[in-house]
Amino acid sequence: MNIQQWIFKTFMASFLAISILGGGSAMAQDSAAGSCTLSNIAGSYPGPALTDPLTPVVVFPAFHFTKLKVKVQNQTVAPECPTSGTFEDWFLNDSPNTEFSQVCQDKLLTLVVDPDASKPMPERFSNQPGVTVKLKDFGKTQSAPFYDPLYVFLEANGYVRNRNIRVAGYDSRLTPDMDGFLERTIALIEETYYENGNTPVHLVGHSNGPLYAQFLLTHTTQAWKNQFIHGFTPIAGNWPGQGIFYPVYFTGLNTIDFTFPTNAANAASSATMFQTHPSSYMSSSDPAVFRKQEVVVQTVQPSKTYTPKDNRKLFQDAGLSLAQELAAFYVGFVKFAKPAFFPNVDVYAEKGSGIATPVGLALQDLSVGQVVDFSTAFKRDGDINQEDITNDAIQVWENMPCFRFEFTNNVGVDHFALPSNTAVLQRLLANLRRPKSVCP
């Protein structure tokens, strides 16, 4: 069994267990004529507040675990693809579109980056002409079905979906400084607070989701957090990024099942797409944390090794000028390690460990569109998706004054099983029932 098969088998084993347990332009918002946001909100919320409310939960999903609905109308960027139609993008999509091939979806979800460096970075990104992307069912649990076991568990303890369990979805191509994420999510949290008897809201994030929650917590006032936030449960947060994302700029990655492409055309379309996504760089290991502790890319011709500290050199040697520019801005984008960026709310973090985890690959060269030989993977301890360096990076939060910081290591529990793990869920429930810290 190669590494790709092993990872996918683990994904599916986790997902099957989850299914059984569960029972079944510019990107920045601009009111000027002709501009639009990349994702538009669709959805509404249920009515009257509960009596004797429970601590409400807002879930921040993992990378590509939020449903995106893509509408294509008279596109010309990919003449070999349908000119019009719709498809959805989300991990484990159970009804994938057959009109738009994976290559077509990659090309249509590739962002256009304005070369004008005088513009603020978030305003330089737009969709391909003729392509619009919406967050499907924003705020609702059906927008992130992977977490159904979490919803079912909370329901068994008195919670009601879409009333005191809500989902702060986002376009996983983008970083939290874009597309009105902050304003949209603040509004969702405040609405949840008021509709549940003015009860502070608990944030639960998984994988990349905690990065978006952390961005929110460090871009709101302490007074706002004191009023609206009960606490924060990050589950396997991808804090300083992960090493395995660096090969993706050359090999691509199919997010419908998190497997690497098996043909050169798909590898090229996917790798090129990820080079244009700001979140790719936010998800790539930050040299400030990783330094030279792991090899992320090793080439055969010429024989050369790259660590996270060499990331700019990697892109320079590959001739990827856009990647060089975006990496300089977005690698290490969400700050967390210094006291100025501590969340200053109660934190109950979870991680997995004890599983050999790929952190890099050996590639033939630095050409874009390579089909991966998984026997070349470099591994270290982790949760199958993220290495120990990533998962342990928030240990610095134990120095956060007054607020609680608890960090639980779930040995042998993989990244994708953590949100449905019985012990994790029981701790979450116990923490939801605890009073929040009152700090000066």
Question: Which residues does each PLM region occupy?
Answer:
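Alpha/beta-hydrolase-fold enzymes
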Residues: 256-325
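Sterically constrained small-residue positions within well-ordered secondary structures
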Residues: 19, 48, 194, 340-341
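Bacterial N-terminal signal peptides
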Residues: 10-22
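N-terminal non-catalytic accessory region
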Residues: 27-204, 208-268, 276, 283, ...
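C-terminal subdomain of alpha/beta-hydrolase-fold enzymes, centered on the catalytic histidine
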Residues: 303-440
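Bacterial N-terminal signal peptides that target proteins for export
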Residues: 2-12
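Generic "edge-of-domain/loop-turn" microfeature
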Residues: 17, 25-27, 65, 357
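Short secondary-structure boundary micro-motifs
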Residues: 2-4, 41, 216, 333
